[in-house]
Amino acid sequence: MNITERIKADLDRRKEDSTFRILGQTNNLIDFASNDYLGLARNERLIDRVKWNFDKTNSKTLGSGGSRLLSGNFPEVEELETLLAKVHGQESALVFNSGYVANLAVFSSIPKKMDLILYDDLIHACIKEGARLSYAKHQSFRHNDLNDLERKILLAEGNVFVAV
């Protein structure tokens, strides 16, 4: 069987097993599957505000096109960070494009070489990836097992970061 025949057979099998997926519109549905927890991606007021701001600034760009450091910083993001810092009584704030990236950034940059990151066995991948990218030691503890967590904390040296 050549590759084309094999792919066709695989697709036919998926159709028979009801595992064949077809992309479609998802309008008028409640979204339980995306990272849009606050529903901002479809918020009409926000969309109108973005359109208004786009016209007001006469912008010719959709999105940053790159990292903020090199090519993608916007004054509106800096204004948001200033506002968030003020609201939370802090010197500064940093906005990330997703919770995944925020967790990755925190766990890869704040813990240092002599520190330990302990995380629940079933923690999200972004925490594990952030820990892996850091210079800190890192290990998991059994899911929801406070005794295992406590034992590992007592054996630790340096600062201990716990993620649950």
Predicted regions mapped to residue ranges:
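General beta-strand structural signal in soluble alpha/beta enzymes
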Residues: 62-63, 94-97, 119-120, 140, ...
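Short glycine/serine/threonine-rich phosphate/pyrophosphate-binding segments
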Residues: 95, 100-106, 126-127
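N-terminal "arm"/small-domain region of PLP-dependent enzymes with the aminotransferase-like
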Residues: 2-62
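Short, structured coil segments at secondary-structure junctions
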Residues: 113, 134-135
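Conserved PLP-anchoring active-site segment centered on the Schiff-base-forming lysine
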Residues: 106-125
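Active-site phosphate-binding strand-loop segment of PLP-dependent enzymes
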Residues: 139, 143-164
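Conserved N-terminal alpha-helix of the aminotransferase class I/II PLP-enzyme fold
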Residues: 55-98
